[in-house]
């Protein structure tokens, strides 16, 4: 088991707190409908700190035209970045853009792949979307997609399951 010193924990908290505070501010602006401020805050985080959920919100704002002109291609770019940070909501949205051909080429195989990765996280919309995407693919396409899915789930799927009955131990070195 990995051990963390109290100093490491303190430094990690101090380093990550400003990004967390900025993200929380961005979410508040978004929920209050102040999309221009939300966009500015999220854009800074998404670009400089590589924050997955900030990237997801960037995709949402581009997709809906909130605080920025609607641009499905840019939405796809941000959903892809967030998807690669294991954000299941972004994986669903990316699959949906591929399925509908909005900002990205209509590609049922890519849609099926990203819906499947989202479903590995047990994201309910992804679980349901797999069925409709699957009906659009041939047996050959499904076989090819399944190879990619296995690789993507390892990279972008849920990480190690945590047993809630086991406490997380932080020990001094």
Give the positions of each predicted feature.
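Canonical positions in the second alpha-helix
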Residues: 44-45, 81-82, 118
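Sec/Tat signal peptide C-region and signal peptidase I cleavage site
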Residues: 17-21
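Terminal, low-structured helical/coil segments at or just beyond the last alpha-helical repeat
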Residues: 127-173
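Hydrophobic face of amphipathic alpha-helices that form TPR/SEL1-like repeat modules
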Residues: 22-29, 44-45, 55-64, 93-100, ...
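TPR alpha-solenoid repeat register
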Residues: 54, 90, 126-128
């Amino acid at each position: 088991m990995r051990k963390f010193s109290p100093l490491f924990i303190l430094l990690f908290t101090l380093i990550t707190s400003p990004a967390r505070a900025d993200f929380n501010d961005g979410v508040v602006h978004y929920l209050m409908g102040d999309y221009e401020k939300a966009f500015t805050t999220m854009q800074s985080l998404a670009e400089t700190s590589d924050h997955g959920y900030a990237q997801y919100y960037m995709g949402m704002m581009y997709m809906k035209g909130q605080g920025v002109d609607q641009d499905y291609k840019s939405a796809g770019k941000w959903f892809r970045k967030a998807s690669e940070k294991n954000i299941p909501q972004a994986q669903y949205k990316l699959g949906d853009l591929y399925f509908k051909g909005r900002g990205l080429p209509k590609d049922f195989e890519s849609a099926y792949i990203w819906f499947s990765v989202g479903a590995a996280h047990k994201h309910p919309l992804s679980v349901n979307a797999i069925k409709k995407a699957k009906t659009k693919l041939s047996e050959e396409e499904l076989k090819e997609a399944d190879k990619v899915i296995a690789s993507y789930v390892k990279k972008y799927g849920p990480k190690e399951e945590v047993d809630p009955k086991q406490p997380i131990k932080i020990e001094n070195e």
